[in-house]
Regions:
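Glycine-rich, aromatic-bearing surface loops/beta-hairpins
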Residues: 119-120, 124-160
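General "foldedness" signal
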Residues: 25, 29, 54, 91, ...
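N-terminal capping segments
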Residues: 1-72
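...with weaker cross-activation on analogous glycine-rich loops/strands in unrelated enzymes
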Residues: 61-132
Length: 160
C-alpha cells in the first residue's frame, strides 16, 4: 500500500466546473434523495483518482446500479472517509477553521447528517462551497441553515 497525495486543486476545479450542471458520466440523484454526496464523491475522486471496490464497505461508482453506498449516501461517505485504512481516500474530522480547499463539510440538523458540501474557497475565513441538490457555486457556509457542521479534511488516499 502506498500513499497518494490529494490533489486539492483538481477537486476544486472539478467542483467549479460541474456545480451548476451534471457530468453525463454519473447518474443524477436529484430525483432519488439528492445529488450532493454523489457530486462530492466525484470531486474527491478528481483529487485522488482511486476507488475502493470492496463490495459492502468500499467507495466506488461504475453505474447507478453498481456503486457503493458511500458514493452517494451522506452518512455512508462520512463513515467511509473517517474509517478507511485501505484503498481510496481517507479523512480526519477537524474544526471548520482547519479546512482546506477540496475538503468536505457535512451539515447536521440535530438528528442526522443530510447535506455534503465541497470547499472551493474562503472569504474572510468563512468557507465558500459548491454543492448539488440545491446547486451552489462559491456559496458562503454562513448562508446555510443547520444545527452543526462537520468538517472532513481529506488527508490523501491509499493505493496498491
Amino acid at each position: 500500500m502506498h500513499f497518494i497525495e490529494y490533489n486539492r486543486q483538481a477537486a476544486v476545479d472539478y467542483a467549479l466546473k460541474w456545480a451548476h450542471s451534471r457530468n453525463p458520466n454519473y447518474y443524477d440523484f436529484d430525483g432519488a434523495g439528492g445529488d450532493c454526496t454523489n457530486f462530492a464523491s466525484q470531486c474527491v475522486y478528481a483529487g485522488c483518482k482511486v476507488m475502493n471496490y470492496e463490495k459492502d464497505i468500499g467507495w466506488y461508482y461504475n453505474s447507478v446500479n453498481d456503486r457503493a453506498a458511500a458514493w452517494s449516501g451522506v452518512e455512508y461517505l462520512r463513515k467511509f472517509l473517517l474509517n478507511n485504512n485501505s484503498v481510496g481516500p481517507f479523512a480526519s474530522s477537524v474544526s471548520l477553521s482547519h479546512l482546506q480547499l477540496g475538503d468536505l463539510i457535512q451539515l447536521n440538523n440535530g438528528f442526522e447528517y443530510y447535506h455534503t458540501l465541497v470547499v472551493t474557497g474562503f472569504s474572510s475565513g468563512t468557507p465558500l462551497v459548491c454543492a448539488h441538490t440545491d446547486d451552489s457555486y462559491m456559496r458562503s457556509l454562513d448562508t446555510y441553515y443547520y444545527n452543526f457542521a462537520s468538517a472532513l479534511h481529506i488527508i490523501g488516499a491509499g493505493n496498491y
